[in-house]
């Protein structure tokens, strides 16, 4: 999980979602997991 000020999709399988008011990227590739904060 990377925590970044701005999250972006890295590949086609990445999905940007909102969970509990936080913007997150989830993906099949676990290296692409990101959270805004």
Swiss-Prot record:
> Pfam families, per this entry?
Ribosomal_L36
Q: Is Ribosomal protein given among the entry's keywords?
A: yes
The Gene Ontology biological process annotation of the record reads: translation
User: Where would one find coiled-coil regions in this protein?
Assistant: none
Q: Which keywords label this protein?
A: Ribonucleoprotein, Ribosomal protein
The UniProt record lists the keyword Plastid: no
InterPro entries documented for this protein: Ribosomal_bL36, Ribosomal_bL36_sp
GO cellular component terms attached to this protein's record? cytoplasm; ribonucleoprotein complex; ribosome
Q: Which domain of life is it from?
A: Bacteria
Task: Extract the SUPFAM superfamilies matched here.
Answer: Ribosomal protein L36
- State a single Gene Ontology molecular function: structural constituent of ribosome
Check the record and name the NCBIfam families matching this protein.
rpmJ_bact
Q: Which family does it belong to?
A: Belongs to the bacterial ribosomal protein bL36 family.
Stated name of the protein: Large ribosomal subunit protein bL36
Organism listed in the record: Frankia alni (strain DSM 45986 / CECT 9034 / ACN14a)
């Amino acid at each position: 999980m990377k925590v970044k000020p701005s999250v972006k999709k890295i590949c086609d399988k990445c999905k940007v979602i909102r969970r509990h008011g936080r913007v997150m990227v989830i993906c099949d590739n676990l290296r692409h997991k990101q959270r805004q904060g």
